[in-house]
Amino acid sequence: MLAALLGGAGARTGTLPGALLCLMALLQLLCSAPRGSGLAHGRRLICWQALLQCQGEPDCSYAYSQYAEACAPVLAQRGGADAPGPAGAFPASAASSPRWRCPSHCISALIQLNHTRRGPALEDCDCAQDEHCRSTKRAIEPCLPRTSSVGPGAGAGSVMGCTEARRRCDRDSRCNLALSRYLAYCGKLFNGLRCTDECRAVIEDMLAVPKAALLNDCVCDGLERPICESVKENMARLCFGPDASNGPGSSGSDGGLDDYYDEEYDDEQRAGAAGGEQPLDDDDGLARPGGGAAAAGGRGDLPHGPGRRSSSSGSGGHWANRSAWTPFACLLLLLLLLLGSHL
């Protein structure tokens, strides 16, 4: 076939440029991967092509190696980390478990990989006929940092990412108001402390708002995915789970922690009122006289400058005794002068 393509030995010189042009055209078709071909669908790359392009970019190659290292324990469970695409992935059985979640450091590595130039193509690449690649993408799907509807061809019944759900809520006045009330009344829920009656009522009101209900059913994604998952877990456990009515402070005011800090502050005030610590003078750094009386609720005279002391302190009495000797010294001096004049 090659001899026929080249036109025989006697005509090689004249037909060689034409053969090269045919080969170059074939390579161009293979590399461009037009729509409908076996190498790509639209602008999506085959996963092995996306991986080669990532390896050719220093930032993407480094992020890919960091991803493989961060997700190594999960990849080892699957036993196939050599798959093309966004690295050999997570066990499908574990990913489908409701109690399983991606490690936070692995999610962070995925986010960093997505921030490179060639990284997003690894997520959106086409596996073609590679079944191993398809199983890898299915397994890693719950860990991808999506910011829109989950899945490339998400339909009306698909699950939405929480980032997109938050955008839609911000554009809706009713949902935005409900979200503001949720942030105001559910502070202890975010910290995993309690779900108050007020917070539970706000959540129930939110579920009646169509756009706000999307926030309850969405899948955590994006940069805030670990925080989102923690809040959802706390809400399911403290507001509607077995711990909803058990444990301290599961209902009532949302200021329980504030009450604790107020009580601690009152104890410090009572300790200071006992005169255990003397206030410092503003000028020389010495203990201010009368400070204990002032802390205990008395008047407590303050000094009017450096070196001055109140008459209520011991040092004040010392200064009063020295001033009392001044008239006696004058009398003695006068007597000595009189005696000297008579002599």
Swiss-Prot record:
Q: Where is the signal peptide?
A: 1-38
Glycosylated positions are N114, N321
**GO BP terms, alphabetized:** apoptotic process; axon guidance; camera-type eye development; cell fate commitment; cell population proliferation; cerebellum morphogenesis; developmental growth; dorsal/ventral neural tube patterning
* Residue numbers with lipid attached (GPI-anchor amidated serine): S315
* Major location (coarse): membrane
The protein's location, in the record's own words, is: Cell membrane
Gene Ontology CC annotations of this record: membrane; plasma membrane; side of membrane
Q: Nucleotidyltransferase: is it a keyword of this entry? A: no
Q: Where is this region: Disordered?
A: 268-317
Spell out the Gly residues composition-biased ranges. 288-300
List the molecular function annotations (GO) for this entry. Answer: oxysterol binding
Q: Which UniProt keywords apply?
A: Cell cycle, Cell membrane, Glycoprotein, GPI-anchor, Growth arrest, Lipoprotein, Membrane, Signal
Q: Where is the composition biased (Low complexity)?
A: 303-313
SMART domains linked: GDNF
**Positions of the propeptide removed during maturation:** 316-343
Record membrane topology: Lipid-anchor; GPI-anchor
Q: Describe the function of this protein.
A: Specific growth arrest protein involved in growth suppression. Blocks entry to S phase. Prevents cycling of normal and transformed cells. Binds 20(S)-hydroxycholesterol (20(S)-OHC).
Q: What is this protein called?
A: Growth arrest-specific protein 1
